[in-house]
Amino acid sequence: MNHATTRAAILPEIIKLIQAQYGLSEDEALHAFYTSAPGASFADDETGLYGQSPNYIFGLFLQEQREREPQ
C-alpha cells in the first residue's frame, strides 16, 4: 500500500475523532487537523506519521490543542 492510500484509509478515523471531541463539522475538523502540526506532518511522507494509528495521531492533535489553550 502506498503512502497516499494509507493516509486515505486512516484520515476518516482521525477526522471522526476530532468531530466527536470538539463537536465540529467534517469540514471544520479537516481544517483544524490540516492546520495543526500533526496534520502537516501527516501530509509529509518524510515524517512517516502516516504509518501510525489514527488514535496515536489524534493524541498528538489533542496534545497540541491543549498546549494552545490559555491557562
Write out the residue ranges for each language-model feature.
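C-terminal alpha-helical interaction appendages
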Residues: 1-71
